[in-house]
Amino acid sequence: MIRKVFTCLTTVVLTFSMMAALLSAPGGFAAKAAEEMPGETPTVSTPEGDPTDPAPDTDAAEGAAEPAPDTDAADNAAYRQSTEGWSLAGSEQKAVLSPAALAVGDSVQFAVSIPADALYELRLLYRCTATQDAGLKLLIDGVSPFSEAQRLTFPAMWVNDGEAQKDSAGNESTPKQTLSDENAHGVARDYTGRQEDPYRFALTAGVHTITLTVEQGELWLEEAALVPPEQPGAYQAPQDSTGVKDYIIFEGEDAVLKNDRSLIPLSDSSNAAVHPSSPEITRLNYIGGSNWASPGSAITWNFHVETAGYYTIDFLFRQNELLGGVVFRHLLIDGQTPFEEAKRIKFGYKSGWQSLTFGGEDNPYRIYLEAGPHTLTLMATPGPMADVYADMQKVTAQMGDLYVDITMITGETVDIYRSYELFNQIPGFNDTLDQIIEQLSTIADNMEAMQEAESGSTVSTIRNAERVVRQMRDNPYSAHRYKTEFYDSYTNLSALMGTMTDMPLCIDQIILAGDAAEVPDTSPSFFDRVLFSVRRFLITFSSDYQTVSDSEEGQEALTLWIRWGRDQASVLNSLIQDDFVRETGIPVKVELVNATLIQAMLSGKGPDCMLQMTRTDPVNLAMRGALMDLSGFPGLEKTLARFSEGAEEPYRYDGGLYALPDTQNFFLMFMRTDIMKSMGLEQPETWEEFIHVAMLLQRSNLQVSLPYTRITDSGSANSGVGGMSLYPSLLAQSGLSLYYSDHSGCTIAEQLQAEVFGEWIGWYTKYKLPVITDFFNRFRIGSAPIGIANYTMYTQLKAAAPEIADRWVATQIPGTLRKDGVIDHSSAGSGTGCAITTLSKNPEN
C-alpha cells in the first residue's frame, strides 16, 4: 500500500513541476539537456507528402487562384493590416475528408473552391484524445499566411467525472476532470490576448489547398471548414412581451464543459452571499477565479427552457482581483453570439459578491429562447484590452531595443559626469523618444477610459514611464543619467504586460428570467450575515490548520508530510484525492510541517512519506536509521526507468537506496535571437565558441550570464552541487566525475579535474565574465542576450516576459569536443527526493 502511494506521489510531484510538459529530453545529474526549444511551441518536421505541391487542376471557368497579399507577413497583426477591407461575406466551404485519428506529424490536406476574394475563419469539429491541447500548423497553398498560423491551438474539452466527493466531516472535494468524449466545434483563434476575434485568412477566388499538420497532442478530426466571420448585428429591443413568468437558476459550479482543465468547482467559506454557503465545512459553490483569466478560456452550462419567450440574464459574480479595473466575457447561446453587445460583457471591480443584469437593470437585454435544451457559454476575452496589449508590446520592444543601443555606448554602469552624446551617437534617438512618449500617453489614455477608477496602479505605471522618457528627451546632455530609471520603467511595463490581458472572474449563479417573471431575492439579510460571521469566528477555535486533508473514520490513512505553501499543498492534495485515492481507495492524509523529521520520529509522530527532501537529507537520515531502504521493493528498476540515468545516485548509501527523485533540475542555454541576428552571431556549440561570442558582446558593452550560487547557509549547500555552477557539467562532458567511484572522497585534486576547474575559473578571471547577474531582467531587456540558467527560466520567460515572445529560444548548453569527434552537451543538475520512513507500518504493500 505504501509503495503504491509512494509511486503515485512521485509521479504527481514530477507533473507538478511541469518538467514533462516543458521538455521531452531527460535531465538530471550528468543528463543530456534538451534539444532546441523555441520561445513558442516548436514546429516539427514536415510530414510525409509535400504540402507545397500545386493545387489540383480546376475548370477553366473557375481559373487558378491568385495568392493572397502579404503571405510572408511576420505576424498576424501585419497580416490583418494587409488584408483590411477584404470582404467578410464569403460562403462556407466545408472540406471533404474522412474522419481520422491524428498524432504528432500526421497531416490532413484538402482543397476548397473559393467563389470570390474574402476573409475566412478555420472551424474544426474535433475531439482531443490526449490531455494536451492540439497544436496544428496551417499551410495555404504550401505557405504559412502568418507566424501564428504555425501553432494554432485547439483546446481539449473537459468534464467533471462524477459528483463532488465528501470526507468524513462533510467537506467536498472537486471532482476529477476527464476528457470529454463528444466532438466539439472550435475556431482557430489567438489565446495570448493580442487579438479578440478569431484568426481570419485571406483567400482569393479559385481553388486552394489547405494543409493541417499536428504539431502537438492527439485529436480525432471529424470535419474541417472555412467559414465567413460571424457578424452579429447590434441589439434590437423586441416590441412585444411574451409574458413568460418562468425563471431558471443554475449554479456556476455545475458547469458541464470547460476548455481548460484548471476550471474546476471552487469553495468560498468566507461569505454568506455565495450559494450554497457554510462557514464550517468546505462547500463547492462557484467556479472561475484566477484559473479563469486566460483569453479564450470558456465554460459552458446546460439549461432547459419550459416556455418559449424572451429571457433576461443575471450573473451573481465576484471580480476582486483587478483593482479598479474591469474584465470582459463573450456570451454565446447554443454556440452563437446573439448580438454584438454580447461579445464584451463588462464585469466591474468589487471586493465581494455582486450581481449584474446583462444590459442594465432599467433596460435589460431580452433574448428569445425556444422551449427545450440549450447551452450558455462564457468565454474570457480581452475586449478592448487586446488593442492596448498590442500597442504595449510594440512600445516595450522599442524601449528594449533603445536600452541595448544606450548600453552599447555607456556600458552597464553609467558615468554621470561624462557626456555620451546619445542624441548624436544613436541615429534617430530624439525621434524614437518622441514616438515612445506618444505611444505611452495614448496607452494610458485608453486604459483610463476602460477603468472604472480614474487612478489605478496600471495607469500610474504607464504615466511614470512616460515621465522618465520625457525627461530623457528634454535633457539631451544628461539623458544618460536616466538610464537606470529607464530600465526600471521597462521592467515595470513588462511585468504589467504579463497580467494585462488576464480577465479573472468568479461565477456563483446565472439566472435566466422570463420577461414577466418575479425572481425571489436570494441575497442574505443583515442578520444572516451577522450570524454567518459569528459561526465563522467560532469555528476558528476548533479548526486544524496543519492538516490539508483527512481520512474516513476507522480507516488507516497514509500520512504525507510536505514543506510547501498551503496553496501548493492544496493542489497536490487535490491531485492525490482525485487520482490515487479514488482509484485505490487508500486514504491519504496530507500535512504541512516545519519540524525536522528526526525530532518527529524520536517522538514517534513522524509520517509515512516525506516529499521535497534536499539532496543531503536522505543519506543523512539513512545513516540514523530513519528511512527505509527501497532497493528491496519489487518493480524498483521499472520505477527508476522513469527518471534520468543517475538521478537516484545522491540518495544511495551503503548499498541501499533511500529516496526517489521527485524533482530534477538541469541547465539550458537561452538566446535572444533578434539581438544575436542583428550582430551576426550564431548559436555556440562548444565552450570555445561561447567564449568567442561573449568577447564579441563585451566589445559592445553587452554581457553573458552563467549560473553560480553563493553558499550563504546550509540550505544553499544542501540543494545539490550539480545545480550551483557549471563545473560539474564540465566534468561530465569530459567523462570525469566529482567523486571517486567508491564514494570515498572528492576528485577535485586530481590532475584532469583540476584542469577542468582551472578552465571554469578562467572564464571569470581571464575573460571577466560576471559572477552574479539578474539574468531574467537582463535577458528580457537585451543587455545579456545569451546566458545559461536552470530550465525553470523557460517557464518564467514564457509567463512573465510576453514582450519578447518569438524573440528568444532555449536550447542545449554548449558542449565539450570528445576524442571521438562528438560534442558532449551533458548537463549536471540537482533536485529533491521523496522517501518512506521506518515508522510506516505496512512497507510490504
Role assignments for model-derived ranges:
Residues D742-I772:
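Glycine-centered hinge/linker elements that transmit conformational signals in sensory
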Residues E553-R566, F580, I586-E591, C609, ...:
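Short, well-ordered beta-strand elements
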Residues Y653-Y658, D662, F667, I691-C746, ...:
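Extracytoplasmic/periplasmic solute-binding protein
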Residues L538-G554, R615-L668, I691-V693, L752-V756, ...:
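Hinge/lid segment of periplasmic solute-binding proteins
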Residues M19-M37:
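Sec-dependent signal peptide cleavage junction
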Residues D578-P650, T673-E685, S783-I786, M793-V809:
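Extracytoplasmic "Venus flytrap"/periplasmic binding protein-like
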Residues A34-D53, D57-I511:
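Extracytoplasmic
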Residues A116, T307, A801-N845:
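Extracytoplasmic/periplasmic substrate-recognition and gating elements
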